Amino acid sequence: MINRVIWIVLDSVGMGALPDADKYGDVGANTIGNVSKFLGGLKTPNMSKLGLGNIDEIKGIEKVESPIGCYARFKEMSNGKDTTTGHWEMVGINSEQAFPTYPNGFPRDLIEKFEELTGRKVIGNKTASGTEIIKELGEEHVKTGALIVYTSADSVFQIAAHEEVVPLDELYKICEIARNLLTGEHAVARVIARPFEGEVGSFTRTSNRRDFSLVPPYDTVLDNLKKNNLNVMAVGKIEDIFSGKGVTEAVHTKDNMDGVDKTLEYMKEDKKGLIFTNLVDFDMKWGHRNDAEAYGKGIEAFDVRLGEILNEMKDTDVLFITADHGCDPTMPGTDHSREHVPFLAYGKALKENVNLGTRESFADMGQTIAEIFDVEPIRHGKSFLKEIVK
């Protein structure tokens, strides 16, 4: 009997380049493998005992004789290597067409329309690191009130503003204006509010980031759970990624540790259904900033907290741990990488030491959850429940 699934996404913790990585410029990417190599090994006793080191030969991650979990690596079926594409595929959406990207900034007519609708001028309009662009344009923004608009290798329209210049409520309204404007050929995956604070020369981003995503085009396993009166509890940016669709309750988080805290709080509530958590620091704080050392320490810090999650699990709980894409901090550039993702599953209702090999789509996870709760199957993915359940 399984009453609840705790599904944790370690954002960007990929595990080796996909066969088509050459099309994305990502040959040789291996986020967890290269981070481990960089640090001379990673201490991950909890994930190792679930089977992390048994998925693939990773230098510096312990391979145990008899893991107590089930383990695999997954290919991405969709085109793309971003957060939205990865998470959407997990719950049953195959994004055949990659979301639009803007390496040279957004078209002038689009920006002019945005300025007209918001009543504020735009500065920036280029591909940039969020921390660098507020250093470069923050002072001008504070003086003029113009919005800093920028993008990245991802399909994102990001708006940075100082919280004392553009109050949060206004910034979020501006993002909604952008979201409504960016449709059709310009339907970017996410509009992101990027508030910052501080004085010139020492601006820092705050934790009040908010994502305004496209609404998923059709029902996912989240909707199917919700329709059957099961709880879908979203932790971190999960609610934003799905634009709230299929979510019954949600909590936003400040960082990875807060994400684990909120997950544990939901676990204590003992509601039937799904706790779906995204831990974003790996990607946002360390992957994009090429900080391999901090990335590795972050993996180790999560592993310590994983001990608390395992202790809190009831006999009717199942735990899934995975990732949504890669972001190898040892690679040139600061973009996501097109990688396999690791997968670990554990619970008293599951068999031990099951090697599921390499699976063809992230959607297999969502299809398995649909079967666990006996709800309508999703459009894509093959359930592996029979292979792992006792």
UniProtKB/Swiss-Prot annotation:
User: Superkingdom, according to UniProt?
Assistant: Bacteria
What UniProt keywords are attached to this protein's entry?
Answer: Cytoplasm, Isomerase, Manganese, Metal-binding
Q: Which cofactor does it need?
A: Mn(2+)
Localization of this protein: Cytoplasm
Please provide the Gene Ontology terms (biological process) for this protein. 2-deoxyribose 1-phosphate catabolic process; 5-phosphoribose 1-diphosphate biosynthetic process; metabolic compound salvage; nucleotide metabolic process
Documented EC number(s):
5.4.2.7
Residues given in the record as Mn(2+) 2 binding sites = D283, H288, H336
Tell me the Pfam families matching this sequence: Metalloenzyme
Which GO terms fall under molecular function for this chain's record? magnesium ion binding; manganese ion binding; phosphopentomutase activity
Which catalysed reactions does the entry list for this protein? 2-deoxy-alpha-D-ribose 1-phosphate = 2-deoxy-D-ribose 5-phosphate; alpha-D-ribose 1-phosphate = D-ribose 5-phosphate
GO cellular component assignments: cytosol
The positions annotated for binding Mn(2+) 1 are: D11, D324, H325
InterPro entries per the UniProt record, alphabetical: Alkaline_phosphatase_core_sf, DeoB, Metalloenzyme, Phosphopentomutase_DeoB_cap_sf
Pathway participation: Carbohydrate degradation; 2-deoxy-D-ribose 1-phosphate degradation; D-glyceraldehyde 3-phosphate and acetaldehyde from 2-deoxy-alpha-D-ribose 1-phosphate: step 1/2
Q: How is the cofactor bound?
A: Binds 2 manganese ions.
Instruction: Return the similarity comment.
Output: Belongs to the phosphopentomutase family.
Query: What role does it play?
Result: Isomerase that catalyzes the conversion of deoxy-ribose 1-phosphate (dRib-1-P) and ribose 1-phosphate (Rib-1-P) to deoxy-ribose 5-phosphate (dRib-5-P) and ribose 5-phosphate (Rib-5-P), respectively.
In its UniProt entry, what is this protein called?
Phosphopentomutase
Q: Which organism is it from?
A: Clostridium novyi (strain NT)
Q: Which gene encodes it?
A: deoB
